[in-house]
Amino acid sequence: EYLTSGGIPIEDARNYHLAGCVDPAIPGKASFLAGNFFVVPKVLEVLLNDGVDPHTGLEAYSFKPPIEGIETFEEFYKAFESALSHFIGLWHEHSFLSGRPKDYYDAVEILETVLVHDGIKVGKPLSRRKPVPPNDFRAAMVPVGAINVADSLAAVRMLVFDEKKLSMKALKQALAANWEGHENIRRMCLQAPKYGNDIKYVDSIARELYRFLIDEEAKYCTFGRPEHGRIRGIGGASISSMFAGGAIIGATPDGRYAGTTLADGTASPAQGRDTHGPTAMLRSAAKIDQSSCASTLLNVKLHPTSLASREDLKKLGSLIKAYAAMGGKWIQFNVVEKKQLLEAQRFPERYRDLIVRVAGYSAYFVDLNKGVQDDVVRRTEVSI
């Protein structure tokens, strides 16, 4: 549906393959250039600090009046959307500049021309043809930590605006202190509704946030120039960006500590926040409009005893089919005990052959850096 909505003929769309990790492309009829990551919680962090990035101390966004003067959640969310739109625009300027070198490397274009359909006959790569063929594919923007933002917005909405248990000033002080001395406020934030549990209060925020991201991306073409490809979309291959992205983000209103890993993928709950079982998790993920995304990614960690029998395998198959029927695009599993992962961290020489799914790719667990290992360990372990 995503491909045909972009003008790709149905016969080509049905012949798609996966470029990179989870992004669809048409073999022999599409060029591919990896997209960039967009760390969504950074926008919320800057907004909560009245336009200043506390990581650098620099003013990154002009926002007035002070965030503490906002009286309704609707006003707060509108301010967040305005900031998000601003930073997405800056992100596209960066994307444009980072893509410019490709325009000057003839060897790249020659290779691309030779490998695509009708390339030798036409004598031009896809990006140089006018009009650019609808099959020309450029990787989408990958929003990192959007689920952390949904959880954070739900906490702000409930505690500051709906129930008025907390002032914005008190929340900002707790975040600035990385919760030290404000453990009671962190406890309140952790108890707020969390995505992944089939709770409308927070799932509706996640859905609305992704809808906004999708609509904003639809305003841009690859590198900001219509002649260089189709309109961009949202991608799901977070790879290990949740670790690097989290390293530059302070504490967030979802109860997360500064510098810790963000939620992986694009549809996965934040680590350990889904407590109502796999069915509730899938229902939350299915509320996101995945048909408008180039790709999405949902990671699930299963306890090995969940797949002990043939009947258990049938249950897993039914779970996957149900998710697809609800509109889910991509779901993947790690079948491993938390105990085994912790053991592998202590004695890596004993687990050289232990393979796990990280994002859209598999890797030897002991070869991953400690931060990414910890992310896999902390994912909720469920049974079916």
Model-derived segments and spans:
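Conserved catalytic cores of very large enzyme subunits
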Residues: 1-384
